[in-house]
Amino acid sequence: MEFEGRIIDTDAQGYLKNSTDWSEALAPVLAEQEGITLTEPHWEVVRFVRAFYQEFNTSPAIRMLVKAMAQKYGEEKGNSRYLYRLFPKGPAKQATKIAGLPKPVKCI
C-alpha cells in the first residue's frame, strides 16, 4: 500500500510487515480497509494493544485481550461483547491490524 508518498509493505491479509511503518496517521487508513471509522473507544483499544505488544512482544489473542482490558479498564470495557461492537470481525485481529502489529498467534 502507498501512504504519504512511500510504500508500506503488508502481508496478504493486510497486516503491516514492519510495525515501525505504523503511525497514528496511518491507523484510520487501516481501519477504513476494515470498514471501521475510528472513535475514541477504538483508539483506546488500539493504543492498549500497542502497549501490550511493546511490553510482552506479542499481539494479544482475544482471551488475553479481554482479560488484560478488564484488569486495566474494568468489566465494562474488558468483555468480548464490548470489544466485538467496536471490532465486529474480531477484536484481536482487527485491533492489532489497525495498530500495525503482527496477527495474533491464535487467530485464524
UniProtKB/Swiss-Prot annotation:
NCBIfam families found in the cross-reference section: dsrC_tusE_dsvC, PRK11508.1
Protein's UniProt name: Sulfurtransferase TusE
The entry's keywords: Cytoplasm, Transferase, tRNA processing
SUBUNIT field: Interacts with the TusBCD complex. Interacts with MnmA.
Location of this chain's protein in the cell: Cytoplasm
EC number: 2.8.1.-
Broad EC category: transferase
GO BP of this protein: tRNA wobble position uridine thiolation
Catalytic site: C107
GO cellular component: cytoplasm
Family the entry assigns: Belongs to the DsrC/TusE family.
Predominant localisation class: cytoplasm
A GO MF term: transferase activity
Gene from which this protein is expressed: tusE
Task of the protein: Part of a sulfur-relay system required for 2-thiolation of 5-methylaminomethyl-2-thiouridine (mnm(5)s(2)U) at tRNA wobble positions. Could accept sulfur from TusD.
